[in-house]
Amino acid sequence: MTDPATLAGDGSALNYCELPVLDSSGLRAADIPKGNTPGCGYDYFPLPILSACTEPLPAEADDIRGLWRGVSGGHVGHVERIEQCGSRVVVTTSGLIHDYGPNSTGGLNTNDTEGSVLFALRGEEHCLRTSASMIWEDKTLNFYAFGWGPRVVRRYREGDELIWEYADGSVTRMERLCRVPEEHKVPQPRGMRVEVF
């Protein structure tokens, strides 16, 4: 479960062009609790999960840390924050937290949701939970459904841009941002919402 202080904090107030130095002076990835998507999604852009982590990246990883916005391709305007520390990667976007890698409280794979609400019962939303692994292969971050299934997402750098290949076949080129845009501080509801009782 994500640290409540992380969810209560204002991650939109930070400058994401000022990245932590990964010099082994602080915590290791495995020392920090796992960050999962709370319920069907967070209510406000949260603080970084790995802010106290300074473990260097493994040789097979590229450094894609920071805040990114889609500028061309399938998901123009999409904004996501990528954190990395050691072998751990956290992608935070649109109400969702994808956290993969060694941690102090849970398994390696992500424990999150696609974001759409299957139904609401007595005012409480219920979403289908999902899981994926994030594996570095030749400086490309590949997401595999459930940790053993097909590759559904790829992220890699081309020059100063981040390239995001998604399961729907789209390819999005992304630029680096320093600040969270106002319209991305509070996530928009995703998918259907069916009220049962």
What kind of feature is each model-predicted range?
Residues 1-88, 92-95, 111-114, 178-197:
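Amphipathic/hydrophobic helical signal segments and adjacent flexible N-terminal regions
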Residues 161-169:
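Short, exposed beta-strand-loop hairpins at the edges of beta-sheets
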Residues 153, 172-173:
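A short acidic/glycine-rich loop-to-helix N-cap element
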Residues 80, 141, 172:
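A broad, low-specificity signal marking well-ordered, structured residues that form hydrophobic/aromatic
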Residues 150, 169-170:
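Loop/turn residues immediately N-terminal
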Residues 61, 84-86, 133-140, 156-161, ...:
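A short, structured loop/turn motif at beta-sheet edges
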Residues 2, 70-75, 94-158:
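Contiguous, well-ordered beta-strand patches that form the walls/edges
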